[in-house]
Amino acid sequence: MAKIVECIPNFSEGRNQAIIDGLVETAKSVPGVTLLDHSSDASHNRSVFTLVGDDQNIQEVAFRLVKYASENIDLTKHQGEHPRMGATDVLPFVPIKDITSEECVEIAKTVSERINRELGIPIFLYEDAASRPERKNLAKVRKGQFEGMPEKLLEPDWAPDYGERKIHPTAGVTAVGARMPLIAYNINLDTDDLEIANNIAKIIRGSSGGYKYCKAIGVMLEDRNIAQVSINMVNLEKFPLYRVFETVRFEAKRYGVGILGSEVIGLAPAKALIDAAEYYLQIEDFDYGKQVLENHLLG
């Protein structure tokens, strides 16, 4: 039985449609891999792809995408609201079916070695693949971003896991890892005050004393002139969607600010959305396995 892996590369390009189209074409170039979704954000200047495939072919398409990005994205000319350090900024592998997290760690290491050997891009391993505890957190790995990486790589504790202590001149540095599924979730505030978004992000994120399974930053969407709380939710069983939404709404109200809306980036597990519906509709004794029609149709 095939071992199924999800790969969610994040690219530092969300404005040039020709480059995005090239990434889409590359993502579809390997048999046995399906491009499930891709989304681009001009304000963030970033694109997120979601692919699934068997454990061998997913490695090939991941390498091809990193290669295409390194040849077509120049970070010396990049501007955007989202933190970034590489043309392919992050490359996580997620176990989906008949494969363990430990096996995904080995996939991450194999792909990392090839990327560095053939493309000359230094690699940091993160999350479950991290070589040391302080590298599990992507925010710590990416701190300094592209512009600060040349100096960071010379620090005693920040030698890349693969490659020399110097960045690729245009493609920067890539973080490759293995992790469990997460939701990338953004909440748009009815204000143009970035400080409010930053303050709310600080309150909810685990690293500053908030929710353990929440990562958050404040960003400014220049094209809409609004502030946004950009969130990664890394454990949906222990930290559901509705809880972060209600917390952000409560904190925003303290500033006299409302919420314009929210968005899910990429794909999300159905149960996470059903849990939110169950909470807001106050459904009693709901059984997700038995009462969702599609669960029966899909077997």
Task: Tell where the protein language model's regions lie, with residue ranges.
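Long, contiguous binding/interaction regions
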Residues: 1-299
